[in-house]
């Protein structure tokens, strides 16, 4: 959709590529959709371009049923207070929910294995609620949000991406206490940081 009133729909080819011709001196909002996936928006502008320009943008749509880790949501140590560094990640989540008005989400908070199980469970519940409160304060309907705290009940399972990033973590390894305690202190901290997450 362009700010000059243009509204163009394009379907991607079998290989996932697409091509659109854009008008000059126009701001656009592009929306990629596919059944079973979350929508994704991208903004671009041709304002000020003098010559023809080839603009490439790849949309990476996340499956609706797969948990999406929110990498930029941080809490004060041992607390459920969101840090100022979380604002960008939280605003991305607000945008995701605004772009996908028909979805509801379970917001899951997880802790590491350090400390008491019951305390970790309580902490994770409060952290999930803190994120939900932020979303509600930014216009998201509370009926679309379910906060859940898992504490240390659901440790990370190492996927291919994490294995490449941390070669000492075997693919499909569950980051549970039995495994983590076999590692050096610095590697244990990496595992603990992976388990501390919001999805």
Kindly give the residue locations of the regions a language model identified.
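Surface-exposed coil/turn segments at beta-strand junctions on protein surfaces, enriched
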Residues: 11-13, 21-25, 50, 63, ...
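Periplasmic OmpA-like peptidoglycan-binding domain that tethers envelope proteins to the cell wall
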Residues: 110-199
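Short, acidic Ser/Thr/Gly-rich low-complexity loop/linker segments typical of extracellular
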Residues: 3-17
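Extracellular beta-sheet/turn segments enriched in Thr/Pro/Gly and aliphatic residues
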Residues: 40-72
């Amino acid at each position: 959709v362009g700010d000059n009133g243009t509204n163009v729909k394009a379907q991607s080819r079998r290989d996932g590529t697409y091509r659109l011709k854009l008008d000059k001196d126009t701001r656009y909002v592009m929306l990629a959709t596919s059944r079973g996936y979350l929508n994704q928006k991208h903004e671009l502008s041709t304002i000020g371009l003098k010559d023809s320009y080839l603009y490439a943008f790849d949309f990476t749509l996340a499956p609706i049923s797969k948990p999406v880790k929110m990498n930029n949501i941080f809490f004060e140590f041992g607390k459920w207070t969101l840090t100022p560094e979380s604002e960008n990640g939280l605003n991305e989540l607000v945008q995701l929910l605004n772009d996908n008005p028909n979805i509801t989400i379970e917001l899951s908070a997880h802790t590491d294995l350090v400390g008491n199980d019951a305390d970790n469970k309580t902490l994770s519940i409060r952290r999930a609620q803190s994120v939900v409160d932020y979303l509600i304060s930014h216009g998201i309907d509370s009926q679309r949000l379910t906060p859940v705290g898992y504490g240390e009940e659901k440790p990370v399972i190492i996927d291919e991406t994490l294995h490449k990033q941390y070669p000492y973590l075997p693919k499909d390894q569950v980051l549970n206490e039995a495994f983590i305690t076999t590692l050096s202190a610095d590697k244990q901290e990496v595992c603990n940081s992976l388990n501390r997450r919001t999805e």
